[in-house]
């Protein structure tokens, strides 16, 4: 086989392989986009909070070792006090970790207050 013929064959085979790979990658991109659009609505609230620098509910629960689904005010306060005391800088703790604990408590407390408001029926206002 001559050199020009081998180079030509190499170019043809290479372009066939590249075109097949491109088509396959394009199909995968379309499939990923379709799959992502279905899960995007659920993740949009969480990703918005992360972009703004806010702590997510899952992260707050992880910091205080509380499951956000089974959130109770007494348990929240107990865990907060314990973690806040452990991370007190005056006792050799970390101010950064203490602030993370505080922000986690703040986030879970607001979530708990929101749940309580949603569960309690709206009180009718009496007009004179």
From Swiss-Prot:
A cellular component annotation (GO) from this entry: mitochondrion
Gene: pam16
Biased composition (Polar residues): 117-128
Free-text comment about domains: The J-like region, although related to the J domain does not stimulate ATPase activity of mtHSP70. It nevertheless mediates the heterodimerization with the J domain of PAM18 and is therefore essential for PAM complex function.
GO MF term (any one): ATP hydrolysis activity
Subcellular location: Mitochondrion inner membrane
Keywords: Membrane, Mitochondrion, Mitochondrion inner membrane, Protein transport, Translocation, Transport
Top-rank taxon, per record: Eukaryota
Protein name, UniProt field: Mitochondrial import inner membrane translocase subunit tim16
Subunit and interaction comment: Heterodimer with pam18. Component of the PAM complex, at least composed of mtHsp70, mge1, tim44, pam16, pam17 and pam18.
Family, per entry: Belongs to the TIM16/PAM16 family.
Region Disordered, annotated ranges: 108-128
J-like as annotated region, ranges: 59-113
Cited function: Essential component of the PAM complex, a complex required for the translocation of transit peptide-containing proteins from the inner membrane into the mitochondrial matrix in an ATP-dependent manner. In the complex, it is required to regulate activity of mtHSP70 (ssc1) via its interaction with PAM18/TIM14. May act by positioning pam18/tim14 in juxtaposition to mtHSP70 at the translocon to maximize ATPase stimulation.
Disulfide pairings: none
Gene Ontology biological-process entries: protein import into mitochondrial matrix
Signal peptide location: none
Membrane topology category: Peripheral membrane protein
């Amino acid at each position: 086989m001559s050199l020009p013929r081998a180079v030509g064959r190499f170019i043809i085979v290479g372009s066939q392989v590249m075109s097949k790979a491109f088509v396959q990658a394009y199909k995968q991109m379309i499939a990923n986009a379709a799959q992502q659009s279905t899960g995007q609505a659920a993740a949009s609230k969480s990703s918005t909070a992360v972009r703004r620098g806010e702590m997510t509910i899952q992260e707050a629960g992880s910091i205080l070792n509380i499951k956000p689904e089974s959130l109770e005010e007494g348990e929240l306060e107990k865990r907060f006090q314990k973690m806040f005391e452990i991370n007190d800088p005056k006792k050799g703790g970390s101010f950064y970790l203490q602030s993370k604990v505080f922000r986690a408590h703040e986030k879970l407390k607001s979530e708990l207050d929101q749940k309580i408001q949603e569960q309690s029926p709206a009180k009718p206002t009496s007009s004179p």
